[in-house]
UniProtKB/Swiss-Prot annotation:
GO terms (BP aspect): DNA-templated transcription; viral genome replication
Catalytic reaction annotation: RNA(n) + a ribonucleoside 5'-triphosphate = RNA(n+1) + diphosphate
Taxonomic classification: Viruses, Riboviria, Orthornavirae, Duplornaviricota, Resentoviricetes
Gene3D superfamilies: 1.10.357.80, 1.20.120.1390, 3.30.230.140, 3.30.70.2480, Viral RNA-directed RNA polymerase, 4-helical domain (1.10.10.1990)
Protein name: RNA-directed RNA polymerase
Length: 1088
């Protein structure tokens, strides 16, 4: 019985502890004799419980089932309704309830007042500022904590200390909640006015954050940090996270580098034993002291003290505590403001006439030139993507909101929807579709707004622009991004790199004669001063490009793009404020355009270049690197003398002065040893990531179900754990138990077992062992996987009805006709499937599929259907391979130094033995020749799944496929007849398998799979010339060895003698692997 199942049965007896409660375990087996006993056992249990008899004698009688079969689920039956939480909570509510300081925040509603003081009536009330937006309730969270506390009340020694720390913190939470009563949620897990009116408005979200924090306490330091954040975040709902995390931008500049990793010419990390001294002018210490004083003013005591104590010797060993504080600060929850404040925040900036026009001019010209450089080649060559930009835009049209709800008719069905894709279909059907006209967003048609909430920052607004903007920008932006892909300055987009590569880039040029300048430009991006020069630079670039081509289609594409920029220079937004919708002229850049990321990166690059060109007037230096990454930019400058305190101070002040000449509200810092940007920070020559993902509060409500959210919760827990913030695993498992249970009736619930939730089926939620993805190969595992596959795809009546309507069919046909030179069923079907999949984001379709899936699941969890599926999964392949491997003990010494101090020990150990990788493994098939050939002639982008299907077809069919996509018949013929085609077969299979094995997710993305140290543990005699088989055997061996090392901290070596006769069988099987989509895989993808 795994740990999960043990916790499950204990949890059930904890929650349903009355006389009437019954828990019936349900078992299954792939062995038909044992399966009969399982069914018998279940029937007798149900019968006994109906008659109120004890189940104990049955457990004795059916010992064979309990010992040899696999637990499928537990059926729980209880009359008791939930007032159990309140009853149990009283026992912990022994402390003094917190009192909110009602003057802690500048904006009135951010103070934690009693709800009825903020909202006089139910009509006025909104939960949007405190909605935890997660499909689990405060009462469940309280239950999970009390379950953990009860389970550990008898712990001894060090574990008892953890128990006491958490108990003490929970007493604060329990006492405060108990004073007002536990807020009851409705069926959508929202908290209504009636429930909240006599309680503090932020009680729920505060309690969720506090529970998340207290369940992450292990050491005494954790306890002090958590206590302070829990108590202060009850009152300070606005600036706490920002105050606590501000010092980090300076702390990274204080630690000497003594040995670090740098990126070498081969783009690998290599150790360098260089020593770089941290040179810190007094001014910087004064700024830091001011930050610490601000923390104290806000009532913080222990956290500023810890920072102050660390400052005495600034050691790298003790820096982990600083990085811990930095991560913890985000767990106070999201800062959710009213839209009106979020919007006005950007409009409050004072305009001054006193700006350096020359610098603005240079900035605009740099943007212009960069745009030209990015698009010059595709424009001069009349690139087909720019010619067919409209089609490309339609093919990748998202199903996000189009800003207004419309009544749409699909066949006989009339629906209301805001989705872009549906609006496009409807407009085409009614002749309203005019992609050549970009609708204005002026005072007559103001832009509706979305929001982005993030801990420690103000709420930001997002434009929800009409779909015409997307179509106009899509193709051009794709070309900009493909340029950025091979330009190192764009750290975020640079080809398959990951953050480790960017880390090595910075450390590479740090030395006694260089300094690094790093700037956070998030304020600048959304400031009013940016908008005119920014849009004008883009417009000027587009004008220059228009003169480089004679193709009217390319000119049209560029003109439409230009029109979007012109329209957005005169933009108005609509903001709901109470019952009125205000129209406000909005003169700043906001996210929501397709170009947001690319254009911001271009602008930030232009900005830092402008600044550096001014600095160069005064100092003589060489710019070693310039990088932009999202809202941040940084540059390493190399001087011809050693850097002194005075130099650092002068450069720092000059840079700030230059920014102020542009009236840019940015935070610019200069250091000799480290940087801090939003995504990562480098200190003491090591790389750190902020572990700030909230677990029990979400930013917004999407259409994911409880199962999906349980998988996301687990995935967030894993990411935090890799980054150095660990939450108690038992608590996470308890949350998964709660969130994956399925109600049958009011008093009857079904709880799936570990096997159901960890087997890679369409229902997978978590891994039984953190960081290790297992692919079950035992009979019972394969049996249950097959059973689940039989019910994986669910029909939706609404979706079918929409898809069979003329409107939908015409749209798909329009796309196919525009795309294809000749009919091709694979592509047409692909388009129809993609378009139909987009309907999933329309709630009724989603709910319908979900209901069908839940009812199928309910049937399955009570008795699995034996099902002979002809589908082959990756498990089948691994199952065929496994028997031919022989394991023996091995030894790998630790040979690499640590560069990511926050990693858990077992993961750190593996990296220190086999090394890390600085690249993403290509798992999309885009590196294959066939993919390149298609993109040369067509705007269609086949998925890895489609390529995998196509490449295994007969040669003639591949040729037809290519020709139908516009590849000239002669090229298609050459391709199929060449050796490239057989290499492609291998490449695509490789990508597909990597994709299935999630090799770029979790902690696998950190390991060097091509490490020679790893290779030498594997011995596979070379038998035939089937590279695909050799590949899968090696990959399986590597995963086995790495998983063993993570789990046991020791190494094994594998020998495989794979019979030649089996190879060809395996090879054939490998062309029929089915991909499984599960909440687990979507959660991984969601992390991206």
């Amino acid at each position: 019985m795994g740990k999960y199942n043990l916790i499950l049965s204990e949890y059930l007896s904890f929650v349903y502890n009355s006389q009437s409660a019954v828990q019936i375990p349900i078992y299954y087996s792939s062995n038909s004799e044992l399966e009969k006993r399982c069914i018998e056992f279940h029937a007798k249990c149900v019968d006994s419980s109906k008659r109120g008899l004890s189940l104990k004698p049955l457990f004795e009688e059916y010992k064979d089932v309990i010992d040899n079969a696999t637990l499928l689920s537990i059926l729980s039956y209880s009359y008791d309704k939930y007032n159990a939480v309140e009853r149990k909570l009283v026992n912990y509510a022994k402390g003094k309830p917190l009192e909110a300081d009602l003057t802690a925040n500048e904006i009135d509603y951010e103070n934690n007042k009693i709800t009825s003081e903020l909202f006089q009536s139910a009509e006025e009330y909104t939960d949007s500022l405190m909605d935890p937006a997660i499909l689990t309730s405060l009462s469940s969270n309280l239950n999970a904590v009390m379950f953990w506390l009860e389970r550990h009340s008898n712990d001894v020694a060090d574990t008892n200390k953890i128990y006491k720390r958490r108990l003490d913190l929970f007493t604060i939470v329990a006492s405060t909640i108990n004073k007002y009563g536990v807020p009851r949620h409705n069926e959508k897990y929202r908290y209504e006015y009636e429930v909240m009116k006599d309680k503090p408005y932020y009680l729920v979200t505060w309690a969720n954050s506090s529970i998340e924090m207290l369940m992450s306490v292990f050491s005494h330091e954790d306890y002090l940090i958590a206590k302070e954040l829990i108590i202060l975040s009850y009152s300070n709902r606005s600036t706490l996270a920002k105050l606590v995390s501000s010092p980090m931008s300076i702390l990274v500049a204080l630690i000497d580098i003594n040995g670090t990793f740098i990126t070498n010419e081969e783009l690998e990390l290599e150790f360098s034993d260089k020593y770089v001294k941290a040179i810190v002018p007094d001014q910087i210490f004064d700024e830091l002291q001011e930050m610490i004083d601000n923390m104290r003013k806000a009532g913080l005591v222990d956290i500023p003290r810890m920072i102050q104590e660390w400052l005495v010797d600034c050691s790298l060993e003790k820096f982990t505590l600083m990085s811990k504080i930095y991560s913890w600060s985000f767990h106070v929850g999201f800062r959710k403001q009213k839209m009106i404040d979020a919007a006005l925040d950007q409009l409050k900036t004072e305009y001054t006439e006193d700006v350096d026009g020359e610098m603005y001019n240079e900035y605009t010209m740099l943007i212009r030139d960069e745009i030209v450089k990015m698009l010059e080649v595709p424009v001069k060559h009349d690139d087909h993507l720019l010619r067919d930009s409209e089609l490309a835009g339609l093919l990748s049209m998202s199903s996000a909101s189009n800003g207004e709800s419309r009544q749409l008719k699909f066949g006989r069905k009339t629906i209301f929807s805001t989705k872009k894709n549906m609006h496009v279909m409807d407009d085409i059907a009614h002749g309203r579709y005019t992609p050549g006209v970009i609708p204005p967003v002026n005072v007559d048609r103001p832009i509706p707004l979305g929001r982005r909430d993030v801990p420690g920052r103000r709420t930001r607004i997002i434009f929800i622009l009409p779909y015409e903007y997307f179509i106009a920008q899509h193709a051009v932006v794709e070309k900009m991004l493909s340029y950025a892909k091979h330009t190192r300055e764009y750290a975020e987009f640079y080809s398959q790199s990951n953050q480790l590569l960017s880390y090595g880039d910075v450390t590479r040029f740090l030395s006694s004669n260089s300094m690094v300048l790093y700037t956070d430009v998030s304020q600048w991006d959304s400031s009013q001063h940016n908008t005119q020069p920014f849009r004008k630079g883009i417009i000027m670039g587009l004008d220059m490009l228009s003169n480089m081509t004679n193709d009217p289609k390319v000119v049209q594409t560029l003109n439409l793009y230009k029109q979007t920029q012109i329209n957005l220079m005169d933009s108005y937004v609509q903001i709901p404020d109470g019952n009125v919708i205000k129209k406000i002229q909005y003169g700043a850049v906001a996210s929501g355009e397709k170009q947001t990321k690319a254009a911001n990166s271009i602008a930030n690059l232009a900005l830092i270049k402008t600044v550096l060109s001014r600095i160069a007037n005064k100092y003589s230096f060489i710019t070693k690197i310039i990088r932009v990454d999202g809202d941040d930019n940084y540059a390493v400058l190399q001087f011809n003398t050693d850097v002194t305190k005075q130099m650092v101070q002068d450069v720092s002040n000059d840079v700030r002065y230059i920014y102020s000449r542009m009236n840019a509200k940015v935070k610019a810092l200069v250091s000799t040893v480290g940087i801090e940007i939003a995504k990562r920070y480098i200190a003491g020559g090591k790389i750190f990531f902020r572990a700030g993902i909230n677990l029990l509060n979400n930013e917004k409500r999407g259409q994911s179900t409880q199962w999906d959210q349980a998988a996301i919760l687990y995935s967030n827990y894993i990411v935090n754990k890799l980054r150095g913030f660990e939450t108690d695993r038992e608590f996470i498992l308890t949350k998964i138990i709660q969130m994956t249970s399925v109600a049958i009736t009011g008093s009857l619930r079904l709880f799936p077992s570990e096997r159901v939730l960890t087997t890679n089926s369409t229902f997978k939620v978590f891994d039984s062992e953190d960081f290790i993805i297992e692919y079950g190969t035992t009979n019972d595992e394969v049996y249950i996987q097959r059973a689940f596959m039989s019910l994986s795809s669910q029909k939706s009546g609404i979706a079918d009805e929409i898809a069979s309507s003329q409107t939908f069919k015409n749209y798909v046909n329009k796309l196919s006709d525009q795309l294809l030179i000749s009919k091709n069923v694979i592509v047409s079907k692909g388009i129809a499937v993609t378009e139909k999949a987009k309907l999933n984001s329309y709630a009724p379709v989603y709910l319908e599929k979900r209901r069908a899936q839940i009812s199928a699941l309910l049937t399955m969890l009570q008795k699995p259907v034996s099902f002979k599926s002809n589908k082959i999964t990756i498990n089948d392949i691994l199952r065929d391979i496994k028997p031919f491997f022989v394991t023996s003990e091995a030894n790998l010494p630790i040979q690499y130094r640590k560069f990511m101090p926050t990693l858990p020990n077992n993961v750190q150990y593996v990296i220190q033995c086999i090394g890390s990788r600085t690249y993403q493994i290509e798992d999309s098939g885009s590196k294959s020749s066939i993919s390149k050939l298609i993109s040369k002639y067509s705007v269609y982008k086949p998925s890895i799944e489609e390529l995998y299907k196509v490449i295994s077809l007969r040669e003639q069919e591949i040729q037809l496929y290519l020709v139908s996509l516009g590849v000239p018949p002669v090229d298609a013929g050459t391709y199929v007849g060449s050796r490239i085609y057989s290499q492609d077969k291998y490449k695509i299979l490789e990508s597909y398998v990597y994709n299935l094995l999630s090799i770029n997710y979790g902690c696998y993305q950190l390991f060097d799979f091509n490490s020679p140290d790893l290779e030498k543990l594997i011995r596979i005699p070379f038998k035939g010339k089937i590279p695909a088989v050799t590949f899968i055997l090696h990959l399986y061996a590597k995963l086995e060895i790495i998983n063993y090392a993570i789990k046991n901290g020791a190494w094994i070596s594998l020998f495989c003698n794979y019979p030649k006769s089996e190879m060809i069988k395996l090879w054939k099987k490998m062309w029929n692997i089915t991909a499984l989509r599960s909440p687990y895989t979507s959660a991984n993808f969601f992390q991206d």
